Structure formats: C-alpha cells, structure tokens
Amino acid sequence: MDKVLEITSNDHIIMINKLCKRILGHPEILGRIIKGFIKEAKDVSLEEIIELIKGKKDQEGNSYFQQLNNVIDIAHHGRVEFDYFCCINLPQDDGTMKRIYLDVEIQNVENPGYAPLTRGNDYLSRMITSQNGKEYDYRNYDGMKKTYVIWILPQAAKKRDGHVNCINSKLENISGSTIERLESYDKSEQIMISKRSMRVVIGSRHR
C-alpha cells in the first residue's frame, strides 16, 4: 500500500509539473512574470508585453519574442533541460531595445538535496555560453545579453509563503572612486518566488 501511495504521489507531482510548464507559456501568465520581475520591463506596459509574446513584429518583420529550445547540450559539459526558456526584446523609454534571456523554473520540491539557487548558477552560465557566436564573440563581449532564472516554488513551506528574493551582481568599491558601468557586469540574476498560489505573478518589483 505504501508503494502505491508513493507512486500515486510521484505521478501527482509529475502531473502538476507538466501542467505548470504549459501554463508558463501562456502570454497572460508569462507577461505578468516579465512585467513583475524583469527590470528591463519597467518601461513597458503589461498589455504591450503580452502583445510581444503573442508574436508582434518590428518594422523589419522580426519577432520581439522567441520561445527557445529548452535543452542546452554542451559537448563534454553535460546537458540541461529548462522548464521554459525564451528571449524577448523589450523597448526602453530612451528608444533603445534590450534583449533578455529568461528561464522560468517550477520547483515542486523545495529542498531536492541541494540549493536550487546553486543549480541556477549553472543554468545562468549555460544561458550566457549559448549566446557565444550569436550575441557576442571574442571580438565583442559587450554584445552579451542579460540572463534571468526565475524560480517558482508552488509548494513552499508555509513559513516562506509569499517571500520573494532577488540574487544579482553588486559592485563593491574597495578603493578609489572609479565606478564600473552597470551594463558591464549586470549580466545575470535569479529570483526566488516562494508562493503557494500563482497570484504572486501580479506583483511588481518596480513599484
């Protein structure tokens, strides 16, 4: 009986995981995640982001949004499979465009034997490496685009329910007054959302 319960529980978790992955790609849901937690989206309305996800094109006929292959397999360095991997070009108030790469992960098990944020560092590095030869090369590293991993924990412990943490690169001025350009080092960010319902995605870090 215990074995039956274990199998039933595992099947239930797998079913939830698959359904959550399908939900993530819905423009209304993904749009709210981007608007709520991506810094580069602060100048763009939710309605416009949803239109970009739905397939809006620029004057040259290029899509602003792409759902990308969620598998990155680097020779001799293993394979990773993201839950939902995409990139989107976000218009800025100054007339420029910022492209970001985004992986949204549904993490049903809060503690799988390691810290999900540590796994996220691996994901971020692979997302950056996958841009080599496309966004940047050895002659122009400045073409590198910012990467995000957003973790959603729908079965977080009650004591963490509603908590949101952001982990990113910070500059520490040890000596002197030289300040490096933010664009030079602000290339990766993780956001951990511990929420027992998806309503958190309507929140915003830009308030």
What do the predicted segments below correspond to?
Residues 1-207:
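Elongated, amphipathic alpha-helical interaction scaffolds
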